């Protein structure tokens, strides 16, 4: 694996586990097995530039995985339940949810820089576009589909954060349980 890719992969895992501010430069260097010069060679603007690269990498990974799941299941409900079941399985197997949430990486940053905010917003826009398209394919209006997509993003992201905070997969199970009613009620609009 190329050095830059290895740095991004290692830093992404560290940022997801400990948050952006929870990972110091020395820890990054040690875990990535690189020198400070190597880090700044690949990321001249330092740790924030690395965070943005991690967010872009996560964006590709998350949207690719969601697209794969959604292409495999014919209905929004089945696809969403499969996605949540996968998240629950990962949490129950490892005690964490790596690779699907960015809030742990940036939540402690009261004021995000514009490039970090843009990278986060892009990820959410991309996942919401996948949700929205699946809903429109099922006959939801564009307006309803977009509203449900935002709500679904908030439910899933919130469910993941609650799983971590409560040390339980129950919050995501609850999200999965309320989805059928949410979709039925919204389709009536």
Regions found by a protein language model. Give the residues of each.
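Hydrophobic alpha-helical connector segments
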Residues: 67-94, 149-152
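Hydrophobic alpha-helical segments that form the core
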Residues: 103, 143-162, 174, 178-181
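Short, charged helix-capping/linker segments at alpha-helix termini
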Residues: 21, 71-74, 139-146
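Helix-turn-helix
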Residues: 6, 10-53
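Amphipathic alpha-helical segments used for helix-helix packing
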Residues: 78-82, 93-115
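Amphipathic C-terminal alpha-helical segment
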Residues: 90-93, 111, 133, 153-170, ...
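Hydrophobic alpha-helical bundle segments that form small-molecule/ligand-binding pockets
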Residues: 113-114, 124-148, 186-189
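Short, basic, alpha-helical segments at the C-terminal edge of helix-turn-helix-like DNA-binding modules
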Residues: 55-61
């Amino acid at each position: 694996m190329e050095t830059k890719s290895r740095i991004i992969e290692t830093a992404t895992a560290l940022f997801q586990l400990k948050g952006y501010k929870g990972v110091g430069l020395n820890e990054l260097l040690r875990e990535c097995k690189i020198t400070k010069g190597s880090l700044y060679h690949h990321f001249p603007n330092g740790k924030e530039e690395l965070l943005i690269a991690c967010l872009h990498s996560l964006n590709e990974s998350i949207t690719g995985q969601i697209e794969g799941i959604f292409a495999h299941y014919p209905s929004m409900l089945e696809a969403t339940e499969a996605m949540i079941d996968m998240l629950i399985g990962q949490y129950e197997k490892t005690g964490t949810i790596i690779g699907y949430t960015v809030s742990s990486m940036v939540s402690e940053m009261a004021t995000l820089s514009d490039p970090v905010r843009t990278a986060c917003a892009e990820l959410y826009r991309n996942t919401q576009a996948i949700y929205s398209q699946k809903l429109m394919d099922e006959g939801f209006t564009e307006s309803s589909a977009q509203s449900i997509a935002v709500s679904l993003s908030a439910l899933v992201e919130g469910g993941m954060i609650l799983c971590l905070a409560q040390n339980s997969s129950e919050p995501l199970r609850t999200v999965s349980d309320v989805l059928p009613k949410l979709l039925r009620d919204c389709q009536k609009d």
